[in-house]
C-alpha cells in the first residue's frame, strides 16, 4: 500500500514539474504577484481611468457607477459595496461665516446636484449630475412618508434596565 502511495506522489510531482514551462535566464528570479514576463520586459504602465465626477451620496448606485469608473466593487452578503471612494465633500465645503454656497446640497430638490464633474467642459456629465433620478425621488418620498407616519425620527424603545438606572 505504501509503495503505491509513493508511486502516486512521485508521478504527481513529476507531472507538475513537467507542466511548468522552462524560462531561460530567469531560473532563480521570482516575479511579483500578478506580473507576467511580457509586462516586466515592456514596462507597461498600469491603466488608470480618471474619475469623471464625484457623487454627493454613495446610496445613488447609478451615480457611483457613472462617475467612479475605476473603483473596485466588493460583494458582501448584505449588498454590493463600493471600495476605494474618496472624500467627495472636502473641496466643496466652505467656511461657515462665508455665507451660502451657490450649489449647496441643502438647496431645494429642484436645484440639488447629485454629483460634481471633474471637467468643466463635460456637458454630458453636467447633464447627468443636474438630473435627479426617479430612484432618488422615491427614496426621499419614502423617508418623508415614514417621518410623517411616525411623527418624526424613530424613537428608541426603552427597556426595563433604563427604568432602573434613572436617577
UniProtKB/Swiss-Prot annotation:
GO terms assigned for molecular function: bombesin receptor binding; endothelin B receptor binding; hormone activity
Q: Name one Pfam family in it.
A: Endothelin
Q: Where is the composition biased (Low complexity)?
A: 97-109
- Residues of the region (Endothelin-like) are 115-135
* Disulfide bridges in this chain: 53-67, 55-63
Identify the InterPro entries for this entry: Endothelin (IPR020475), Endothelin_toxin_CS (IPR019764), Endothln-like_toxin (IPR001928)
Q: Which SMART domains match?
A: END
Q: Which UniProt keywords apply?
A: Cleavage on pair of basic residues, Disulfide bond, Secreted, Signal, Vasoactive, Vasoconstrictor
Give the stretches traversing the membrane: none
Q: Which GO terms describe its biological process?
A: axon extension; axon guidance; cell population proliferation; cell surface receptor signaling pathway; establishment of localization in cell; intracellular calcium ion homeostasis; intracellular magnesium ion homeostasis; melanocyte differentiation
The signal peptide here is: 1-19
Q: Which residues form a coiled coil?
A: none
* Compartments where found: Secreted
Q: Propeptide per record: which residue ranges? A: 20-50, 74-167
Q: Does the keyword Secreted apply?
A: yes
Q: Which PROSITE patterns match?
A: ENDOTHELIN
Q: Which domain of life is it from?
A: Eukaryota
The entry's family comment says: Belongs to the endothelin/sarafotoxin family.
Q: What does this protein do?
A: Endothelins are endothelium-derived vasoconstrictor peptides.
* Name of the protein in its database record: Endothelin-3
Amino acid at each position: 500500500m505504501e509503495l503505491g502511495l509513493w508511486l502516486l506522489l512521485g508521478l504527481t510531482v513529476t507531472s507538475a514539474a513537467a507542466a511548468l514551462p522552462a524560462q531561460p535566464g530567469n531560473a532563480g528570479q521570482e516575479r511579483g504577484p500578478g506580473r507576467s514576463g511580457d509586462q516586466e520586459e515592456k514596462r507597461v504602465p498600469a491603466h488608470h481611468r480618471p474619475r469623471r465626477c464625484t457623487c454627493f451620496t454613495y446610496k445613488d448606485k447609478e451615480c457611483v457607477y457613472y462617475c467612479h469608473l475605476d473603483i473596485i466593487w466588493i460583494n458582501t452578503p448584505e449588498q454590493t459595496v463600493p471600495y476605494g471612494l474618496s472624500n467627495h465633500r472636502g473641496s466643496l465645503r466652505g467656511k461657515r461665516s462665508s455665507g451660502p454656497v451657490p450649489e449647496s446640497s441643502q438647496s431645494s430638490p429642484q436645484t440639488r446636484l447629485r454629483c460634481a464633474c471633474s471637467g468643466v467642459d463635460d456637458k454630458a456629465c453636467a447633464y447627468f449630475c443636474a438630473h435627479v433620478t426617479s430612484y432618488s425621488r422615491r427614496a426621499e418620498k419614502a423617508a418623508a412618508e415614514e417621518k410623517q407616519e411616525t411623527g418624526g425620527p424613530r424613537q428608541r424603545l426603552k427597556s426595563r434596565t433604563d427604568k432602573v438606572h434613572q436617577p
